[in-house]
Structures are given as structure tokens and as C-alpha cells.
Amino acid sequence: MNPTYITLFSCAGVGCYGFKMNGFDCIASNELLEPRIEIQRVNHKCKYESGYICGDATLSETHQRIYDEINMWHEKEKLEQVDVVFATPPCQGMSTANYKKNDHEQIRNSLVVQAIKLIKAIHPKVFVFENVRAFMKSICTDVSGEDMVIKDSIYKNLSEDYNIYWKVINFKDYGVPSSRPRTIVIGTSKQLTHISPLHLFPTRQKEILLKDSIGKFARLQYCEKDKTDPFHFARPFPEYMLDWIKDLKEGETAFDNPDETKPCTFDADGNRIINKGAYMGNKYRRLIWDRPGACIATRSDVMSSQDTIHPCDNRVLSIRELMTLMTIPNTFRWTNHDDKLTVENSDEYLKENEGNIRRCIGEAVPTQIGSDIASKIRTMLDFESFITKAELQKDSDMNFYIQAFKLVGEIPIIDSFDKINALPSELSHVSIKLASIADSLAYIPQLCAYYSAADSIDIDIVGLNEEDNNKIESLFKLIKMGSNVSVNFRPSVSVYKHYDVVVENGTCRAIPQRKVNKKSSFENELQLSFFD
């Protein structure tokens, strides 16, 4: 049976499309708005029609429909336990993009609590929250009726049954060609003794510059369409705005112009009123080729939204460019008519669908992030099945954890997670020392995730013989550790070299910084660097 998942507040299903790409079956998908559920239908997200649950997540009948779907899977598909619940509660009350907040923010944030209730009732093997960077510090009304920060509510209700880890990351450092600072929270059931939340976090990757992601698309003049792609077009805008942006260089905003060409409105007498405000800094601004794309907002159709103007062309980014910046594959469909869409018949289609498509892209989890997490969950679930049921999947030869277990036997994953979670986390350059095969295999994947935001992670494996070094090197080829990681095999190290973290005898500890008067020296050094 394929691994399974349920999505809550799933919008158009862009992020969880990554689960579909990795062979997961969707049991149920809950979303409030029917047009977005329809996009999920077009992409054949759920196995059964009854799995598309359009409804208010605060209502008990919506919860019951989800439970009914799970019960149907128990009977029809012989489901034992839901593998994943993936939740992305609406974030308007927490987001900095929507600065006009209101008195209902706290109630809206309490949609998070509906997800917590469902996770507690469903008891999946893994749960994942994705939200804005302020997510864990925002106030919600807990299940108990008490007001508390979301972090406390999650831990209070779920930490008894789950190992939980969270961090704020920028998706541009994890394979997405646009900036998107977000909070990821992952919980793994304590019944799964060989899966840690750190195993499931996205892998650090090199930044992808704007020129390398959308630079391949055709340049477009005012109102021009790409003759080969109906989703790549220059969206029309009032021609008088052309004077505001036509002379802008990369990174400049129309508010850098002389007064006569600054963005404005007109009063009843026809007098120009220059737009002013504290939040104008990223409006009418050109993007920069040699940086990742800016964070994509829901109003990418207008130049007055945040960072929407092409680096060279006088237009906002096209739908195809936005899809690329959010790693949405071309196989993703927005309507049942996409396969018949041509440049010639696209006007009516875009008139009806463009606004919804752009809003869905602006609210989405990038598909790459969903895919990376899903791939890692599948790998770890296969490992857990191998340990508990002696089941080998067809790709087990490529599963790092199965092969590591065959080499060294028991790997103390949960013990190592608890110890790693107690380490200092805010380090820009991390130096780590290990001295055994078992410690290396248990700790290195998790330490790489724990310190994924660091500029560099320098790992020394010390004192092993050549045969053991070769075994570890061979296994590491089966896993992506991150573009900021280098692994070095050393016969010995100088006593003067400082390590931030030392792992030995199945435990790890942080080492305080000390002054060093002599330079470290190494002999017969073999260094292997892994850049993904």
C-alpha cells in the first residue's frame, strides 16, 4: 500500500502536489473555497471523490467528514494508520504581507487549533505545519479556551505523543528560486523509534538566481504574448503607468523617480497626488537578475504589489514565471481546459481564471518543499517498516538508513534527536567531530538538518581505518546532506583545533569556544565535500 496523507487548509494543493509526485495517496483534503477544491480535482489529488472536503474547518461536521473518510479507508483499503497530516492554516493574522490587521486575528489564528484537534484525533505517524515566520510566536485561543502562543499550544497538546522540532527557514536556501521565509513544524510519533523530525526537514541547497530560473523565458513587450506558451504573457496595465517604470534599473522603485514620474493618483480637479506611505518601499520595484526572486504575494497581477516588476521588461511577472519561481511543475493543471489551451484562445480563459491562479500561487507552499519533505518521509517510513516488519521496498538498496542499519545494527535515532535538540542552534559556522561509524551514521544526517541555516558545516570523522572510511563514504552517496556541508576523514586532529560539537560513545555535547595560540596541523588528510 502506498503511504497516505491528509491535507488541511490545502488551498489549490500546490505544496501537497509534491506528495503526489512521491507516490502518496491522499485520503482527504479540506479546503474552504470550492474553486480551489476544483483545482485539486483537476489534478486527481484524492483517490476517491468523497475525499474532497469543501467546508469550514471550525465546524464539527467538517471534522466528521474527515473521520468518515478515514473509516472508509480502514474498511476499503485496509488502512492501519494515517501516515501524514499536512496543515497550512490561513496566516492573515500573522503575516507581515497583510499589514492591515483587524480585531479577528486571534480567532483566525485559532484555525491552527482546529488542526491540532484533528491531529490529536487522527494520530498520524507524522504531522507537518507550514506557515509564516511569526507563526509560533502568534497568539491563538487554545483547545482549553486559554490564550497562548501557538508554539505552546502545539507542544501542550501534541508533545506527549510526538517528538517535535520547528525552525524558521527561507525556502530560497532549499531549492526554491524565490525568497519565502517560513516556519516548518514537524512532529513524528513516539511510537516510531527510528524516525526523528530532523530526518524530514528539507535539504539545504545553493541559491538559484532569478536569471537562472526565469531568464530562459521570452522577453515580452507591452501586452505581448509568448507564441508558444499561453501562460507566458505581458499582462495589460494602464499605459500612463509606463512612464513610472520604463526607465527603472534593477532594484529601483518608481518612487526613486523625479516627482513628475512618481506613482500618483488625481484629485477631483485633476491635480497629481504622489502616493506616500510606510509600506511603499517594495512597490513598483524591479526585480534583480543576480538574486533569487522576491517573495510572491497574492496580488502579483499589479505593479503596486510587492516586487512584481520584471528585471528588464515593463510588465509584471507572467503566470509561467511565477509557477517556475514556486517550483510548480508544468504537469500541474489549473482547470480541465489547460490541455486545450492555446495562445489564440487564451483571452477568455485568463479573464475567468487568472486572478484565482495568481492568488493560489501567492498562498502556496512551493511544490519543491512538499516534494522534499514527502520524499524523506517515504524513505524513513520504509526504514521503519524494514526494522519493525522486516519489509524491504524495491528501492531499499538506495535507502541510506536501511544500508546503515545493515552495516552497524541498531542506530540510536531518538536518543540522538533529544541530545541534538539540546545543542546551541544559532551558529553561522559549525565544526563537528565524530569518531565512530555508528555515531557518524546516527548523528550526521540530523546534525546537517539541525544546522542547515549555518553558512558552513565542517564535519571531521577521526581515527577510523581506511576500510571504515570507505564504507561511510559509500553510504553518504545515498543521502543529500546539504550544499553547506563538507565531510573530512582524518587519521588524527591537533589538540588545538576547536570543535563546536563533539560526538562520541553515542552522545554529543557542545564545546565552549577557547583561545587558540597554535595553528592546527593535519597529516595524510583525505577530504570529501558534498555539495547538492
Region spans (language model):
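Conserved acidic residues
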Residues: 27, 83, 125, 428, ...
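Short linear proline/tyrosine/threonine-rich motifs used for host-factor recruitment
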Residues: 272, 485-487, 508-510
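Core alpha/beta nucleotide-donor-binding catalytic domains of modification enzymes
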Residues: 2-122, 133-147
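Residues that mark the start of a beta-strand
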Residues: 4-5, 429-431
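Class I S-adenosyl-L-methionine
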Residues: 68-79, 92-283
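Short, aromatic/basic amphipathic alpha-helical patches
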Residues: 151-154, 446-447, 470-482, 500-501
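C-terminal target-recognition/interaction regions appended to catalytic cores
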Residues: 239-408, 518-531
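A short, well-structured beta->alpha microelement
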Residues: 407-423, 435-442
